[in-house]
Amino acid sequence: MNFQFINSNINNEDKLPMESLKKKFLKQNREIIKINTQLSIKIRESENEIQDLIQENFTLKSYLVKLEARFRNQSQTEDLLKNFFPEIQTIHKKISQVQSLLKIIEKKCSSDFLEANVKSQFTTCENKDSKEDYQILHNKRLEYVSFNDELKSLETGQPLYCFQDFQKKVHGPPALSEKPGKCILKDKTNAHVNKIPQDEVNYSLPQKNITIFSKELKENEFESINEGETEEEKAKTSNVCVCIPCKSAEQITDLKGQATGDSSPCDFEESQPRINGREKLRRSVKVINYAIPSLRTKLRRDFDLPSDRKRKRHPRGKA
């Protein structure tokens, strides 16, 4: 009896510390769970901030590329201006001298001076008509006035802008032709093509040899200018017509290769599989799932981001 009483006391003493330890561990686990939830919320917020920063980086990179291009162009123009600055100054001096001369010419090209000059020429050269001389002098006066206006516009502008405009004119892209050739694609459904019989339509390529054509070009290089201009105008106004025959519903063939004349377009449409809304959604989700990892790898390579590998869980030691 005494032995049994002693064993029961020992078991009661062992249960008390175990329950206290369990309570402590439960409290610790609850605190850890709270901390984990707070950290997960902070991680989500940081991910959103990272996405915003990535978008800002993209925009900043585009702005940097544009600024670098502008800086290169400006540096080139400044170098050219430094090299040719004395020549530009001499040009402006000559422009001012020409303007002073034009003022003198305008005074001399007045109506009284023109009439006196016409009368003197009429007396010296009796064969010439006075009207023709007057028109010639009047045209010359108009040329001087237009040239004077151009010089005033050059004098008001800065040398840098004048030089940039000159550079654009010299090194600019080649001017496009006023009347480019057109390519007209015609279908069998077009009424104009349906009127043309099939015998008249030529689908064969030109049989002329390329080497002969190149020799003819070399021989005709030294022809007259007027003939060249007429050929260029013909080439500009000519249109390239391309006839594209399309299959009708009567010419649709079976799998065996036999033509079915009685088949209708409705039967052909029914043979094709129909896609439901669920199938479209499933395919779109699949495409997105395939595209997401490739985007992640691209962002890592562009911005040198660390790889998002899953953390390895270390095995806990057994008590």
From Swiss-Prot:
It comes from the Eukaryota. It holds the Pfam family Shugoshin_C. One of its GO terms (molecular function) is chromatin-protein adaptor activity. It is found in: Nucleus; Chromosome, Centromere. The keyword Glycoprotein does not apply. Residues 33-62 form a coiled coil. Changing K298A: Loss of function. InterPro entries: Shugoshin_C (IPR011515), Shugoshin_N (IPR011516). GO terms for biological process: cell division; homologous chromosome segregation; meiotic centromeric cohesion protection in anaphase I; meiotic sister chromatid segregation; mitotic sister chromatid biorientation; spindle attachment to meiosis I kinetochore. Changing I50A: Loss of function. GO terms for cellular component: chromosome, centromeric region; condensed chromosome, centromeric region; inner kinetochore; kinetochore; meiotic spindle; nuclear envelope; nucleus; pericentric heterochromatin. Changing R296A: Loss of function. Ubiquitinated by the anaphase promoting complex (APC) at the onset of anaphase, conducting to its degradation. Keywords: Cell cycle, Cell division, Centromere, Chromosome, Chromosome partition, Coiled coil, Meiosis, Nucleus, Ubl conjugation. Belongs to the shugoshin family. 'Shugoshin' means 'guardian spirit' in Japanese. Plays a central role in chromosome cohesion during meiosis by preventing premature dissociation of cohesin complex from centromeres after prophase, when most of cohesin complex dissociates from chromosomes arms. May act by protecting centromeric rec8 from separase degradation during anaphase I. This is Shugoshin-1. It comes from Schizosaccharomyces pombe (strain 972 / ATCC 24843) (Fission yeast).
